Amino acid sequence: MTDARPVGVVVDTMIISWFFDQHPNPVADRYRALIGTRPVLLAFQTVMELRYGALHAGWGELRRRRLERRIAELTVAQPDDEMISICAELRQGCRQVGHPLGDKVHDGDRWIAAAAIRLGLPLASHDGVFAGAPRLELITVAPGP
């Protein structure tokens, strides 16, 4: 029996938005290269942020349906009891070491990180808030601090 590592990458809202966008984006291309052929997964929080962004921007029904079709092509990690506990532990762990994910303003980001930790997968993000978060494996091309 082998210890097979889960396959896939959780991507945050910024990255998946870049992937869904049809405009050329060299940074998005770098993330595509890093992710390669691994399956892309979304946290439920990312789906909420995508839908909110579409509503806030006043997208029409056709464009919102196109977004929903793109989301439906991917696996969405839904919260379960273990993810909820991981999110609480992550907040406490971050608060103890002074990491910004411990702050309330980052509740959404923390859920995305908790989804990646729960699934045992890396998180692809261009957001520096995730750098150095306990238990989180981060894939990024963002410049360091």
Mark where each language-model region is.
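Short, hinge-like loop/turn segments at secondary-structure boundaries
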Residues: 57-61, 94, 140-144
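Short, well-structured N-terminal submotif of metal-dependent ribonuclease cores
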Residues: 1-42, 52-69
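Active-site neighborhoods of divalent-metal-dependent phosphate/nucleic-acid chemistry enzymes
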Residues: 2-3, 75-124
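Histidine- and aromatic-rich ligand-binding microenvironments
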Residues: 11-12, 43, 105-106, 127, ...
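A generic structural signal for short hydrophobic patches within well-formed alpha-helices
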Residues: 16, 47-50, 130-131
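Generic structural signal for small/hydrophobic residues in well-ordered secondary structure
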Residues: 12-13, 50, 87, 116
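General small-molecule cofactor/ligand-binding pocket signal
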Residues: 41, 77, 139
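Acidic, PIN/NYN-like endoribonuclease modules and their adjacent C-terminal/linker elements
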Residues: 1-4, 113-145
